[in-house]
Regions:
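Short, basic, low-complexity termini and linkers enriched in Ser/Thr/Gly/Pro
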Residues: 87-104
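Active-site-proximal, acidic helix/loop segment immediately C-terminal to a metal-coordinating Asp/Glu
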Residues: 7-28, 124, 130-190
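Catalytic core of PPM/PP2C metal-dependent serine/threonine phosphatase domains
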Residues: 7-88, 123, 188-194, 202
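DG-centered beta-turn motif at the end of beta-strands
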Residues: 1, 81, 140-142, 196
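Cytochrome P450 core scaffold surrounding the K-helix E-X-X-R motif
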Residues: 85-91, 118, 147-153
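Phosphate-binding active sites in nucleotide-utilizing proteins
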Residues: 4
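Intrinsically disordered or compositionally simple regulatory linkers and C-terminal tails
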Residues: 203-207
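Short gly/ser/thr-rich secondary-structure transition/capping motifs
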Residues: 57, 116-122, 181
Length: 207
């Protein structure tokens, strides 16, 4: 999810996708956190960023995962974007793993973008084991930040988690229909779509 609109945002998206594709095909970096650090270095270099400027928001928010099909291990690193896991197995909670009802967990990101920032810490990584039938949801902030409803407010993270919880046992085609119709009803006839919206679900084969 790149900052900026129009040409600047589109350029940043193309740059990020190209760099991630190069890293994935090179097969030299397997760790999502190291990939984000490499991506940040490459973007800062490509944009010629030399100092942090609060008025310059060129950068990228991203949730990046790798999955080992043999071990069932998911590795996640995030720059401002969390992910949601629906798991039949209990995942131990931590300061970065927040459990919710009915097997839903939110994996929290590092609070910094892929860009030159006032905090340039290393990206951290969460490693969990998934089970057959578990699902992973990745999403940009366009859905939760969409204005609408009777009070013209943001949809919000709590409502989004509740929505995922309510549809998680349905087929993905049914989930897609409900998730889309929900935000359309929320937006109504008076609100414009405020940002790009992406919600992506991945389910492990099995029970």
């Amino acid at each position: 999810d790149c900052t900026g609109h129009g040409v600047p945002g589109g350029f940043m998206s193309m740059l990020g996708v190209s760099m991630l594709n190069d890293m994935a095909t090179a097969d030299s970096i397997q760790s999502p956190s190291l990939m984000l650090q490499s991506l940040r270095h490459n973007i800062v270099t490509a944009l010629g960023q030399t100092s942090f400027d609060e008025d310059n928001h060129d950068g990228m928010d991203i949730a990046l995962c790798t999955f080992d099909t043999k071990s069932g291990i998911l590795n996640y690193a995030g720059a401002n974007l969390p992910i949601i896991i629906n798991s039949k197995s209990e995942i131990p909670p931590s300061d970065r793993i927040q459990p919710y009802q009915d097997g839903l967990y939110e994996l929290k990101p590092d609070r910094m973008p892929v860009a030159l920032y006032d905090k340039m810490d290393s990206f951290s990584e969460i490693r969990i084991k998934l089970s057959p039938g578990d699902a992973v949801y990745l999403f940009t902030d366009g859905y939760v930040d969409q204005f609408g409803g009777p009070k013209s407010k943001k949809f919000g993270h709590d409502a989004f988690r509740a929505l995922i919880s309510s549809v998680k046992n349905l087929s993905f085609s049914e989930q897609k229909q409900i998730i889309w119709s929900t935000i359309e009803r929320w937006k109504g006839e008076t609100e414009n779509q405020t940002d790009d919206i992406l919600v992506m679900g991945l389910k492990l084969p099995g029970k």
